[in-house]
From Swiss-Prot:
Pfam families: RimP_N. Belongs to the RimP family. It comes from Cytophaga hutchinsonii (strain ATCC 33406 / DSM 1761 / CIP 103989 / NBRC 15051 / NCIMB 9469 / D465). The keyword Cytoplasm applies. This is Ribosome maturation factor RimP. Required for maturation of 30S ribosomal subunits.
Length: 167
């Protein structure tokens, strides 16, 4: 990790301390030394507003400029909300999704959809969706099989996305 990346992470951390309702979802660096791209993804429990992203971007940009972090080199700073299509990465994101259907990919390769029932510091409890099974020569049918809630530790989850439904 470069000196600039460490400095930016420190700036983000300091700015978040002043804005306790916001939390960091992810920070990514890309580009070349002469043209860096910094992507900061923020959220809050009630959902972050575009104005809050803009205000945070201005504050972070001011710190970068005041400290002449990139000298004469160009950089692009983007501060964004996670968006509905991005994976859930931190436990606070899961709390907002209680009652929603999520798509899980576990570290062991298991994939399934489930309704998020609860969230703790260690992980989540989900209710898997009914399974589709074939009955003889008939088409697939959803069969009511006794499905039990399933506990997952965050360490077991490789990827988790919200399933967006427009019903």
């Amino acid at each position: 990790m470069s000196k600039q990346e460490l400095e930016i992470k420190t700036y983000v951390s300091d700015l978040l301390q002043e804005r306790a309702e916001l939390f960091l979802v992810d920070i990514a660096f890309s580009g070349t030394h002469s043209r860096r791209k910094i992507l900061v993804i923020l959220d809050k429990d009630s959902g972050i507003l575009i104005d809050e992203c803009g205000e945070f971007s201005r504050a972070l940009g001011n710190l970068i400029e005041e400290n002449n972090l990139f000298g004469d080199n160009a950089y692009v700073l983007e501060v964004s909300s996670p968006g509905m299509d991005r994976p859930l990465l931190v436990s606070r994101q899961y709390k907002r999704r209680i009652g929603n259907t999520l798509s899980f990919l576990l570290n062991d390769g298991t994939q399934f959809d489930a309704v998020l029932e609860s969230v703790s510091e260690e992980g989540v409890v989900v209710m898997p969706a009914p399974q589709k099974v074939k009955k003889s020569n008939k088409k697939e049918a959803v069969v009511d099989v006794a499905i039990e809630p399933r506990k997952l530790r965050f360490e077991e989850i490789k990827k988790c996305n919200l399933i967006v439904s427009f019903k």
